[in-house]
Amino acid sequence: MSFGTRLLLFLILTLPLVTSSSPNTLHVSGIVKTGTTSRFLMMTIEDYDDPSANTRHDPSVPTNAKADTTP
C-alpha cells in the first residue's frame, strides 16, 4: 500500500474515535459553544446508626457448636 492509501485508511478509522470522544457541542444560531454538563453523585456515608448491643443475643444460652473440634 502506498503512503497516501495508508494515510487515508488511518484517517477514516480514527475520525469516528476522535469525534465520539470530544465534548458535547451546542450550535446556537451560528455561534458554536463547547461545553460539558457535570453530574454529581450524592452519597451518604452515614448509613448506619450508632453501634449498640445486640438485644437478641443471650450468652447464657449454650450453642450447639463444640468448643474443641481438633481430632
UniProtKB/Swiss-Prot annotation:
Propeptide: 21-46, 65-71
One of the record's GO molecular function terms: growth factor activity
Subcellular location: Secreted
Gene label: PSY2
Keyword tags: Glycoprotein, Growth factor, Hydroxylation, Secreted, Signal, Sulfation
Renumbered residue ranges of the record's region Disordered: 50-71
PTM annotation, UniProt: The sulfation and the glycosylation are required for full activity.
Modified residues (4-hydroxyproline): 62
Biased composition (Polar residues): 61-71
UniProt signal peptide: 1-20
Entry annotated with the keyword Secreted: yes
Gene Ontology CC: one annotated term: extracellular region
Protein name, per record: Protein PSY2
Residues modified to Sulfotyrosine: 48
Record's function text: Promotes cellular proliferation and expansion.
